[in-house]
Structures are given as structure tokens and as C-alpha cells.
Amino acid sequence: MEQSVSAEQIELKSSLPGSKKVYVEGSREGMKVPMREIELSDTNGVPNSPIRVYDTSGPYTDPEYKVELEKGIPTPRRNWIIERGDVEEYEGREIKPEDDGVKAASNHTPVFPQMDRKPLRAKKGANVTQMHYARKGIITSEMEYVAIREGVEPEFVRKEIAEGRAILPANINHPEAEPMIIGRNFHVKVNANIGNSAVSSSIAEEVEKMTWATRWGADTIMDLSTGKNIHTTREWIIRNAPVPVGTVPIYQALEKVQGIAENLTWEVYRDTLIEQAEQGVDYFTIHAGVLLRYIPLTAKRMTGIVSRGGSIMAQWCLYHHKENFLYTHFEEICEIMKQYDVSFSLGDGLRPGSIADANDEAQFAELETLGELTKIAWKHDVQVMIEGPGHVPMHLIKENMEKEIDICQGAPFYTLGPLTTDIAPGYDHITSAIGAAMIGWFGTAMLCYVTPKEHLGLPNKDDVREGVITYKIAAHAADLAKGHKTAQQRDDALSKARFEFRWRDQFNLSLDPERAMEFHDETLPAEGAKTAHFCSMCGPKFCSMKISHDIREYAKENNLETTEAIEKGMKEKAKEFKEAGSHLYQ
């Protein structure tokens, strides 16, 4: 088994080209909110102001930070948590070999060699969720941090959390995480799924995927590991993750019963929840809406039940002919969640896995139950978001958003795409980004990325990059459509740079500067091409923007308005044509 992960084992890159890490200070000492500042060149001697953008990359892009993965990243939130006075350290549960799928203790690797702190939990009778604080009228340090990142007032953040329209996923045992918010009145967020399988990947690879995904803009990470070393892989990811980490606890619980769904018990699952909460998982996908009576509704589907968690619980329900134990024990789950401030991501175990099954009775029956469970969670002041489909054609997407807002009382929606067609394996990052942009516009708060490997295999780091960038495009397009007050600043800056032929600024303002520069340099690699007033698409004679510049220059020289310049130029060209004999070809 693997002993540790070092910075030398994975590729860690500095900040993106033309950018630098900057920090905005909050009201309390030591609160530093990260931003990425993109420096811009002058336009004919007139300075262009730098553009600041949201940054998810954590300390890895700070040139003053020394990466030591075996120690984990800094824990700025720990003091905030302790100062509130409502938590206590305790010994925590014993880490067992079976947590990593190992039978003998002699084969078990130490989980995280330099972990020297005990887990935290709420003191007896206390509730430590951000929703609980918000409902008491308290603006926490986390809420202020989020307000600075989003460019809004802290009171607005508090109110959105208190009313359930947004969540701030921040387990008290994940102090490494930089606070962020998920809600339809904030920037649309992107989640990246990582995790090993029974046949592929290592701890080092998964840690690298995490740092890689956050570099390109992933707002949260889900560790969906189903292979060996589940506990240890998760520990290394969380200790080094600057963003919230989510999981599907039923996957690990299933490993503890040797992969036999019918052998699952509430006791095994409960133990797994506590194990992961003590590690610092920020949100759990829990498929508590897959009820026994809904399973027959999937019988006539084209693709049945495609959710792994949903199919596991359906199999358990049918084998025992009992109601889903996640549903029957939901109040007890809430009691665990509020001790650590773990947020619910209520799973859509009956989501459609094909266009043929979109918006069917099974899907919406489960959604009704998720609405019921949302009310129960809110009774405990536990934060909730709702997971959504799936495979949905464009004309049926809006109905999903409208039903979710109505049935789940406006809780944030978190969707996988949706994929808008089933005919493009290898390109499902595109088929799903179409749906993601639409549903983000309609109100979805977070989009779960899809990589080119969807339906085909486990994604590697290049697939992760492709998936994140594709979904950042969808999320930004949704922000523009919703009229988010700061969304268009970057578009306008890039458009201005494009019109002024500031090529390097164009590259640096893009979501993937390295790819933009690479494509440009394939045909025009010379340094002089970075200042040329054309690209290889049109060349120097047919560049529309160069022609526009020429028209403006002509108008300026002749003291004309642009429209007058065009008319005058047209008349002059017509005169030249007639004087040359009116021949089409000279």
C-alpha cells in the first residue's frame, strides 16, 4: 500500500499566465480573501485597469507558499470555529483497517502521518451549522468571507442562508477550506468529481486531480472513490483541499459489507457518516428519496435506475421488502449533520439516464419526497441542496427548475448537466454543458461537471481540465443571462483587448490562457504575431476588426461620423469602379 504523497509526485503549477494572487482583507485580523488579478497592457499609452476574478486555487498559486502535501494546507478557519465556544475536541472513532477495505491491521497504512489534532463536534445541546447562526441573526466570519468573494453585503449572505436559498458548506473539521456559497442569487458554481475505482488510480493521482481541478476553477470537489484506500484517499484530499469536499457515503458503507447491497445496515451507514464527518467532509449525497413504492415506476424505463446510490438502495429495499433506511432514519441523520455542520445534498437516485426517461413519474415522485425531507432538515437548521438530472432534452429543462423551486421551497438546485442528447459518447461534456448553461440561467446554483470520458471510463487529469473549463463556460454564460452585476466585466475587457489586437491580454483574460495561446501559436508562433493586427483565420487583408479600425481612422481624418464615413467611402469606391470601365474582373 502507498505510504504517503509528496509534492514531487504530482504536477503543481503556479498562477495562470499574466495573473497574480492578491488578497482582500476582511474586518477581522488575519482574514484574507483570495482573488486572481489579471494584469492588462496599455492601449496607446492609456492604462487598462487590471481585472480581478474569483479564485479557487487555494495556496498552490501563491508564490510565497511552500507546498508540503504531507502536512496539509493552512487552517485559517480553525480559530473562527474555536472562538465561537460551541465546539469540543474529542477522541473520535477508531480508524479501522476495513475503513480502507483492508482486513488485516498489519496491511493498513497510516492515514495521514502528520495529523496532530483531534476531531471537533458540537457541545452537548449545541448546533454549529451556518444556517443555525444565520437564523439567530449572527453574521459569521465565513459569511463575511463569502460576501467579499461574491461582491455583496454580509447581511445578504446571512439572509439567503437563513431562508434556505443558499448553503455555505463548511464542516468544522475542514478548517482548510476557503468559505464559499451555493445559491441561485450568487455566482453559479461548478463541482468536479474525482475518485478512484476498483481498477484504476492511486492516492497521488486523486490528490493531483483535486489540485488540478481547483486550479482551473472547480468550486467544490466530490470524492467518489469506490476502490481501495477510500478513507486514506479522502484524508489526503481533505487535508489539502481549499474547497469544500463532498462524498456519497453509501459507497464506502457498501465496501464495508464486501459490496453486497443487501448486507447494508443502518449501523454500518451511521458509523460511516460519523467517520466521514470527523474527517471533514462538507456535504453528503444521501439517497433518502428512493422509496420502496417508487421502484416499480422505473420498470418501464429505457435505462432503469442509473444512479449508483439509487440502485444500491433500490436493491436493498427489494431484497428486504422494507422502506429505505435512509428515509426511516432521516431525523437521526440530521442529528449527526448538525454536530459537524455537514450539508445535505439530497440525491436524485431516480434521475433519468436517457432522453426517453426524462421528466417521468419516478423522477418527480422522488422530488416530492426530497421536498418533504428538506423541511425536516430545516427543522434541525441543517443546510440542504437538491440534486437534479441527468438526461433531459432542452424543451423539458425549465420544468425541472420550476418544480424544484416549488416542491423544495427554493433550496439550491445542483444538477449533473443535464445532457441534452444521448448520441455523443466522447463529447458528453458538450452535450451536458448545453443543458447546464440553460438550467443555470433558469436558477440552478451549482453544476456538476461532465468530462469527455462520461459513460466511457475514469477521467484522467486532462479530462478533469476539459470538464472544468467546459462547465466554467456554462456557469459564466448563466451568470451573464441572469444579469449578475460583475459577470460582464471580464467579457468587456476581453472584447476590448480583441478589438485592440492586444493578443496577450486576450489569452490571459480567457478561462484557459494556455490553450488559447497554444492554438494561436500553432499557425503564428513568432513573437511579432502577438502584436499583429490579424490572425491566421482571415489574414491581414480580411480581418473585420482591422477594417473597422480603418473605417474609424478614415472618419477621424475626414471629420466624419462613422456612418458618414462608410457612405462616403462607398461612393468613392463606386466612382472608382465606374471610371475603371465597370468591369467585374479587371
From Swiss-Prot:
Residue numbers binding Zn(2+): 391, 455
Keywords: 4Fe-4S, Iron, Iron-sulfur, Lyase, Metal-binding, S-adenosyl-L-methionine, Thiamine biosynthesis, Zinc
Annotated binding of [4Fe-4S] cluster, by residue: 535, 538, 543
Record field: catalytic activity: 5-amino-1-(5-phospho-beta-D-ribosyl)imidazole + S-adenosyl-L-methionine = 4-amino-2-methyl-5-(phosphooxymethyl)pyrimidine + CO + 5'-deoxyadenosine + formate + L-methionine + 3 H(+)
Pathway: Cofactor biosynthesis; thiamine diphosphate biosynthesis
Cofactors: [4Fe-4S] cluster
Enzyme Commission code(s) on record: 4.1.99.17
Pfam families in the cross-refs: ThiC-associated, ThiC_Rad_SAM
Gene3D superfamilies: 6.10.250.620, Radical SAM ThiC family, central domain
Domain of life from the UniProt record: Bacteria
Biased composition (Basic and acidic residues): 92-102
Keyword Iron among record annotations: yes
Function: Catalyzes the synthesis of the hydroxymethylpyrimidine phosphate (HMP-P) moiety of thiamine from aminoimidazole ribotide (AIR) in a radical S-adenosyl-L-methionine (SAM)-dependent reaction.
Name of the protein: Phosphomethylpyrimidine synthase
